Amino acid sequence: MKPSDWLILQKKVRFGDCDSAGVIHFHNLLKWSHEAWEESIEIYGIPYQDIFPDFSIRKSQIIFPIVNCEANYLAPIKIGDLLKVKIYPHKINPHLFRVNSFFMKNGNKVAEGKIIHCSLDVDSRNKIELPDQLERWIEASNISTNLKEC
């Protein structure tokens, strides 16, 4: 598997994603950014439940709350647009990581999102190191930092 398999994804803009002006509702960009990195780790091979556990089934020792997020809109995104979403994860320090998402339409960047997560112990809420499998995903993703496939 090559990095583009888990770092370049697609998103089709649906009617329900848009507001009355016919462009995406502002909150959807951050939602799509989060969904993209969720999909990316699954494609990479990390079981979804290891990062986002169902606490009714089993209790995870780690949670990843969002501590910062941003969205920038560079051009209108409309119903029916097919977007490529390029993911760039980056380790900030032992307990923080950032995922940048670049949304491309017809080869042009139309939006970007940034989400920063903190790794915490579920009981104490103290900061803890990122789990090894997440570290491996970040490291493997950064091997090819200049994906030109959009």
Curated annotation (Swiss-Prot):
The keyword Calcium does not apply. The lineage of its organism: Bacteria, Bacillati, Cyanobacteriota, Cyanophyceae, Synechococcales. InterPro entries: 4-hydroxybenzoyl-CoA_TE, DHNA_CoA_hydrolase, HotDog_dom_sf. This is 1,4-dihydroxy-2-naphthoyl-CoA hydrolase. Catalyzes the hydrolysis of 1,4-dihydroxy-2-naphthoyl-CoA (DHNA-CoA) to 1,4-dihydroxy-2-naphthoate (DHNA), a reaction involved in phylloquinone (vitamin K1) biosynthesis. HAMAP family: DHNA_CoA_hydrolase (MF_02101). Its EC number is 3.1.2.28. Keywords: Hydrolase. It catalyses: 1,4-dihydroxy-2-naphthoyl-CoA + H2O = 1,4-dihydroxy-2-naphthoate + CoA + H(+). Disulfide bonds: none annotated.
